[in-house]
């Protein structure tokens, strides 16, 4: 429903890069926030909002590699084969470890062990990333480890990644690593790896996941006050990346909001990402949700069939600019004066502080 208007905001593609010297820290923060959203929407990592300093295990990294590949569409929930003595078929990431091992993206240890709970190092991770890009052992001659790392640095896969080869990676490092992967050209095609997952690059060379967000975004859904969030999405909310009113948040924070407020959510099942908007919470600008009863529907004097705005019982005017919203509130649509609705709006303010609300979506009570 109404996905094209929403996808750009969900994907977070509007981040700008600060260029003034005294804005360096802000620029870095914005860049990381953008990367988190892209990697989350791409479905590579389940939760890009919390635990960013937590080390990533070899089992988790194998799962990330598979989810960053075309094998993601064939990843079974359980594995029927155990390829390592310390990875039983019942292990959480057994299927991903099997695929990663079969594709030679990541290797085990002597004695048939994988050591799934051991933290992944940059050198191990680099092997997997280069393999996804189409590089094999034949590309690196006899000095495999050093040649791989040289290629890794040459491709600038270490951008925003300040680790030595033998250092372990945390979740923040992996966000940067996989974002860099998406920007890097595939060995044989010369096209950005992002295209493998249905993304593309913007004109400035950054990843634009708009296609993924547009295709897989579900919603809006109105989560009633005091409800269980898990009843509204088809995945474990505690493993999700969560954004509240456009900012990175957490399950506990969203749970707290739902306990006392109505909340509108959108979600991407592939990426396990939730975008939530707290109803009637004041925001300076950007996306917001408003609940109320429709009091008036206004039409243009030149076109009495096409509504241009509505008012709710709060007295505020809400503009209708898209054809979908105009149809929904027209005589042909489903909304009438007196109906209870929740509007999802884009709020902007002029230099005088006067606010304008434009309706981009709605939920009928």
Please give the residue ranges for each predicted region:
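Short nucleic-acid-contacting surface segments enriched for D/E, G, S/T with interspersed K/R
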Residues: 247-265, 326-344
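Structured, solvent-exposed acidic/aromatic patches
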Residues: 167-172, 177-179
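Short aromatic-glycine-enriched beta-strand elements
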Residues: 301-311
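A short macromolecule-binding patch
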Residues: 316-324
């Amino acid at each position: 429903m109404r996905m094209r208007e929403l996808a750009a905001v969900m994907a977070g593609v509007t981040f700008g890069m600060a260029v003034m010297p005294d804005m360096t820290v802000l620029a870095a923060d914005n860049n990381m926030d953008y990367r988190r959203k892209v990697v989350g929407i791409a479905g590579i990592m389940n939760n890009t909002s919390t635990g960013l300093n937590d080390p990533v295990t070899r089992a988790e990294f194998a799962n990330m590699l598979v989810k960053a590949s075309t094998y993601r569409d064939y990843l079974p929930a359980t594995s029927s084969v155990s390829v390592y003595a310390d990875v039983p078929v019942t292990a959480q990431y057994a299927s991903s470890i099997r695929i990663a091992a079969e594709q030679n993206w990541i290797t085990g240890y002597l004695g048939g062990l994988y050591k799934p709970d051991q933290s992944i190092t940059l050198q191990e991770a680099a092997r997997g990333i280069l393999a996804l890009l189409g590089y094999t052992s034949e590309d690196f001659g006899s000095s495999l480890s050093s040649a791989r790392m040289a290629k890794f640095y040459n491709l600038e896969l270490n951008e925003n990644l300040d680790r030595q080869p033998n250092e372990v990676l945390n979740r923040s490092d992996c966000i940067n690593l996989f974002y860099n992967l998406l920007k890097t050209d595939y060995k044989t095609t010369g096209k950005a790896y992002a295209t493998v997952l249905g993304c593309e690059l913007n004109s400035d060379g950054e990843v634009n996941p708009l296609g993924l967000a547009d295709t897989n975004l579900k919603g809006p859904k109105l989560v009633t006050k005091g409800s269980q969030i898990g009843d509204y999405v088809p995945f474990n909310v505690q493993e999700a990346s969560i954004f509240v009113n456009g900012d990175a948040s957490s399950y506990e924070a969203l749970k707290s909001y739902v306990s006392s407020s109505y909340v509108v959510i959108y979600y991407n099942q592939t990426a396990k990402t939730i975008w939530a908007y707290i109803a009637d919470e004041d925001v300076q600008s950007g996306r917001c949700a408003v609940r109320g009863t429709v009091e008036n529907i206004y039409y243009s004097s030149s076109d009495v069939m096409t509504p241009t705005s509505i008012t709710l019982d709060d007295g505020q005017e809400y503009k209708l600019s898209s054809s979908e919203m105009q149809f929904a509130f027209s005589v042909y649509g489903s909304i009438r004066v007196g109906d209870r609705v929740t509007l999802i709006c884009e709020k902007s303010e002029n230099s005088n502080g006067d606010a304008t609300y434009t309706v981009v979506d709605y939920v009928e009570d």
